[in-house]
Amino acid sequence: MKKTLGRVIPVVSLFLFTAASLLAAGQAAPPTSAVTWPTKNWPKGTPASVGLDEETLKNFDVDIATGKYALTDSFRVFRCGMEVFAGRYQHDYAQIYAKESKTKGPLNARLTGSYNYFDPEWHPFYQGTDLHTMQSVSKTVTSIVLGVAITRGDFKASLNTPGLKYFDVARVKNVNDWKRQMTIENLLTMTSGMNSEELFYPEGSDAPENDFVHMEASDDWVQYAIDEPVVEEPGRNFTYSSAGTELLARIFQKETGQDIDSYAERYLFAPLGIRHHWKRDYVGTVDTEGGLYLNDEDLAKLGFLYLNNGLWENKRIVSEYWVKQSVAPHVPMPYTVEDGRLYYGFSWWLIPSNGQYAWMATGFGGQELMVFPRPKPDCSVHRVGRSEWRN
C-alpha cells in the first residue's frame, strides 16, 4: 500500500505545497545581469518585479495570520536573489506554554525542558533573539558542512568508508556484518539499515516506539546511536533515522579533528554572514540531528548557495559536484504526492513538482525550506513555526 506524505510529515508541508503551486503559477523570473549576494542583507523586491502575483501572496498572508497554518512564526519568499515577500506573525508563547505545559502533546512530550518546544527557557527564539529552532533542518545543514569539508580537503575519507571505523568496536553493542557494512553515505541517505523509524508516529516524541526520543533521553547520544541494531542490509531501503545523522557528529570530528559546529562557523556560516546557535548533548557532542538554530533570512541563504551551485560572492564554498549529488534522487521514499514519488538525497527531501524536483529541508514542528531550482522558478520559500502532526 502506498504511503502518502500527509501521514508522515507535519501538516505545514501542505502549506508549502500550496505555496509551491502559487509560485509555479507565476510568470518566469526575469533575467538578471548579475547576482547580488545577500551576505549582509537580502535586497528587497516586489512579487511583481520577479513575476509573482502579489494579490495571491497577500491572500495567503491573511490565511496564515488567521491561523489556517497553525502557529506560523514567519513565511518568506525569495526570488532572483531578492526577498519579495515577508510575513511575521506574533504569538504569546509564554501564555501558550502556561497552557500547553499542563497536557502532553506532539510538541511537548515532556511537560518541561528541551522536549517541550513551547518552553521559552530552552529555545532562544523566545529569549529576545530571532534564532529559531531548525529541528531536522539541522540534518540538511550537517550534509552541507560535510560537503564543505570534502571540498576543502579537510574530510578525506570516502563516503564508502564504514562508520564503525571511527569507534572502538569492542565497546559497541549489536555488531554484525550489516553494521560493519554501514557507510557514511548510508547515513546521509537514510539507508543505514538501523532499527529506527520515526515518521509513522503522529503522536510525535510521545510515541514509545519513536527512536529519537529514546536517544535524546540517553546520556550519550552517539553511543546510543552506534549501539542500535542494524536489522537489514545497508543501502537497500529508506528508514528515517535521527540516530544515523547523530553519528556524523563523531565521524566528522574524528576525520577532521574539529567539531562540526566550529568548522561550520569558519567555513560556511561566516562567509555567508549567518548567525547561529548549535546545541550539544549531555556529553558535549554537537546535536547534528536537530540542534541548530538560525533566523529565517539566514536559512534562505543556504538555499541560495545551492541555487548557485555552491558559490558565494563568486568564491567556492562547496563543490558543484557535492551540490548536484546532494539533490540527486539517491533512494526512493515510500511516500507519494500528486506529481509522483518522493526521493531522498544527501539529507535533502526531493519533492516532484512540475517535471523536476523541489529541494526541501524539513524539521519537526514546521521548520521548512523549499527551493525551486532553475530552469523553473529559481525561488526559495521558507516557513518557521509550530504545528501539530496530522494523523
Question: What annotation goes with each model-predicted range?
Answer:
Residues 275-276, 323-380:
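Active-site Gly/Thr loop motif
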Residues 122-128, 133, 151-195, 227-230, ...:
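Active-site helix/loop module of the DD-peptidase/beta-lactamase fold
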Residues 71-73, 132, 366-368:
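Short loop/turn microsegments at loop-to-beta-strand junctions
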Residues 1-7:
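N-terminal secretory signal peptides that target proteins for export/translocation
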Residues 143, 190, 244-251, 290-311, ...:
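Active-site-proximal alpha-helical segments within enzyme catalytic domains
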Residues 4, 13-126, 150-156, 223:
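N-terminal leader/targeting segments and the immediately adjacent pre-domain N-terminus
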Residues 53, 58, 81, 130-159, ...:
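Active-site SXXK
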Residues 87, 97-122, 160-165, 203-233, ...:
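Short, charged, amphipathic alpha-helices and their helix-cap/turn boundaries
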